[in-house]
C-alpha cells in the first residue's frame, strides 16, 4: 500500500472552520459523550443487578447499551482531543482503522436491532413457545452472530478502501474519516467501487429497515387479540424499539444509499448517528418501560442504603 500512496495523513476540517464555534461544538460533544456513557452503563448495571430483568429482551438491550458506548467512543473523544490539542490531522492507517471500527460497530448495531425485532415478534406472536425459541443458547448465538456479521461488513469495507491509491489532495471536509470523502480523494476511478460500497452499506440498510418495518407491522396487527393492558405494554415496548430503529437507519440510508457525492448535511447526519442517537437510546428505552424504571428505583434505594451505613 505504501508504494501506491504519496499521502500518509489527512487533514480533517471538522464541523466548521470557525474556531470559536468549533470549541462550543466540542464542549457540547463532551457533555453528550459523558451523558451517553453514564446513561448506557446505568442501564447495563440495572439489568445485571435486577432479578426482574432476566428476559432475552433485556439481555439484548445490555449489549445494545454497551455497543452505544463503544460506537460513540469512536468519534467523540477524538473530536474533543483534537480541539484541545489543536491538531486536525489523522494518519492514513488511523483513518482506515477509524473507518473499520465505525462500520464494525454500525454493522453489529444493525444486526442487533434485527435480533431485537425478532425477539419481540416471538414474544408477542408466539408467546407459548417464547422460552423454547429464545433459549439462552439461541440468544448467545444471535449476539455472537451480530458481532461476526458486523466484523464481516467492516472487513469488506476495509478491503474496498485498502487498495485505493491516494496521491493528493489530503483534505477531508469532515470531522471523521468519511467513506465517501475518501473515495472522492482517490487518484483513480472509483465508480465501480462506489457502487459496491452502496451495495454493501446502503442496500443492506434499506433491506433490513424494510424487514424491520414489516416485522413491527405484523406485530402490531397481532395485538388485536390482546387485552387492553397487554396491548398497552406491547405497544410501549414496540414503539420504543421502532423509534430507535428509525433514529439509527434514517441517517444510515441517507449517507450510503446514493451516488458517491458529498453534502454539507453529511456532517449533521454523522453527528446524529454517532453521538446523538447513542445518547437518546437509553432515554427511549427507559422512559416508557415501567420494569426498567422500577428496577432503577430499587437500585437507587440500595445505593442510598449502602451510602447511609
Swiss-Prot record:
InterPro entries (alphabetical): GPCR_Rhodpsn (IPR000276), GPCR_Rhodpsn_7TM (IPR017452), Olfact_rcpt (IPR000725), Olfactory_Receptors (IPR050427)
Ranges in the topological domain labelled Extracellular: 1-23, 78-98, 157-193, 257-267
Cytoplasmic side: 48-55, 119-137, 218-233, 288-309
Protein's UniProt keywords contain Lyase: no
Keywords from the UniProt entry: Cell membrane, Disulfide bond, G-protein coupled receptor, Glycoprotein, Membrane, Olfaction, Receptor, Sensory transduction, Transducer, Transmembrane, Transmembrane helix
GO molecular function: G protein-coupled receptor activity; olfactory receptor activity
Subcellular location: Cell membrane
GO CC list: plasma membrane
Carbohydrate attachment residues: 6
The keyword Membrane appears for this protein: yes
Membrane topology: Multi-pass membrane protein
Cysteines joined through disulfide linkages: 95-187
Transmembrane stretches, start-end: 24-47, 56-77, 99-118, 138-156, 194-217, 234-256, 268-287
Pfam short name (any one): 7tm_4
PANTHER family in the cross-refs: OLFACTORY RECEPTOR
Family (UniProt): Belongs to the G-protein coupled receptor 1 family.
Known function: Odorant receptor.
Protein name, UniProt field: Olfactory receptor 4C6
Organism from which the protein derives: Homo sapiens
Organism phylogeny: Eukaryota, Metazoa, Chordata, Craniata, Vertebrata
Gene: OR4C6
Amino acid at each position: 500500500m505504501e508504494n501506491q500512496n504519496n499521502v500518509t495523513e489527512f487533514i480533517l476540517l471538522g464541523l466548521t472552520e470557525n474556531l470559536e464555534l468549533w470549541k462550543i461544538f466540542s464542549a457540547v460533544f463532551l457533555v453528550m459523550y459523558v451523558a451517553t456513557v453514564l446513561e448506557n452503563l446505568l442501564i447495563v448495571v440495572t439489568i445485571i443487578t435486577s432479578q426482574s430483568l432476566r428476559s432475552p429482551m433485556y439481555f439484548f438491550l445490555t449489549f445494545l447499551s454497551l455497543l452505544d458506548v463503544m460506537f460513540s467512543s469512536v468519534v467523540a473523544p477524538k473530536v474533543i482531543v483534537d480541539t484541545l490539542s489543536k491538531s486536525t490531522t489523522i494518519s492514513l492507517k488511523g483513518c482506515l482503522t477509524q473507518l473499520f471500527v465505525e462500520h464494525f460497530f454500525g454493522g453489529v448495531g444493525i444486526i442487533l436491532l434485527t435480533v431485537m425485532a425478532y425477539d419481540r415478534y416471538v414474544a408477542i406472536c408466539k408467546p407459548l413457545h417464547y422460552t423454547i425459541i429464545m433459549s439462552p443458547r439461541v440468544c448467545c448465538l444471535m449476539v455472537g452472530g451480530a458481532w461476526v456479521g458486523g466484523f464481516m461488513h467492516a472487513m469488506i469495507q476495509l478491503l474496498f478502501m485498502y487498495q485505493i491509491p491516494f496521491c493528493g489532495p489530503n483534505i477531508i471536509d469532515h470531522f471523521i474519516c468519511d467513506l465517501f470523502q475518501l473515495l472522492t480523494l482517490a487518484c483513480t476511478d472509483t465508480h465501480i467501487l462506489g457502487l459496491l460500497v452502496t451495495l454493501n452499506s446502503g442496500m443492506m440498510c434499506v433491506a433490513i429497515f424494510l424487514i424491520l418495518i414489516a416485522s413491527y407491522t405484523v406485530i402490531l396487527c397481532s395485538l388485536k387479540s390482546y387485552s387492553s393492558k397487554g396491548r398497552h405494554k406491547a405497544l410501549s415496548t414496540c414503539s420504543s424499539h421502532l423509534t430507535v430503529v428509525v433514529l439509527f437507519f434514517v441517517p444510515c440510508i441517507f449517507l450510503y444509499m446514493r451516488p458517491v457525492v458529498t453534502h454539507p448535511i453529511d456532517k449533521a447526519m454523522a453527528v446524529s448517528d454517532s453521538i446523538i442517537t447513542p445518547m437518546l437510546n437509553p432515554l427511549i428505552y427507559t422512559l416508557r418501560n415501567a420494569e426498567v424504571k422500577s428496577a432503577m428505583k430499587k437500585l437507587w434505594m440500595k445505593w442510598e442504603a449502602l451510602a447511609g451505613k
